[in-house]
Amino acid sequence: LDFTIYHIDQGSLALHHETYPENIKATLQPISFAENIHREQQSKVLLDFKTPIHTGLSFRTIEAVGYRKKLITTNIHVAEYDFYHPDNIYIWDEKTFDGLDEFLESPYHELPAKIYQKYSFRNWVNYVLNIPPHIVIGLPEADS
């Protein structure tokens, strides 16, 4: 397990060892974008912890889809998207790890090619800039 948390200041770094187990490393040194991509490509599973200031998807979620990686997330809204598959995305309730072992042992479930195309960087740019052709990337319908 190679898990390092980047802290933005000395204060959060000082609290690190009170909060996390010793096998989770801490650093004040950011890694480059290229190194981050390399680490993602080498990983079997990506982690995504939702911040309290947003409810939407993080780039980590989209990266997991694009790199065909399993994802462990605290964002319950991910289950509302068309790329969600329980073999690929484990939604952690931050209380128990029920089903995590089975999730990690199960193979990645390939999604339809159209899903990978829809959430690709090229399609995202084309959609945002309204450059045809592109696939519309809509938000899930809210429950009424």
Give short role names for the model-derived ranges.
Residues 1-54, 73-78, 120-142:
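Nucleotide-sugar donor-binding catalytic core of glycosyltransferases
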Residues 91-111:
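C-terminal "capping" alpha-helix adjacent to the active site of nucleotide-linked donor transferases
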Residues 37, 60-66:
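Short alpha-helical segment that forms part of, or immediately flanks, the ligand-binding pocket
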Residues 58-60, 71-82:
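Short glycine/proline-centered loop/turn elements that form peptide/ligand docking sites
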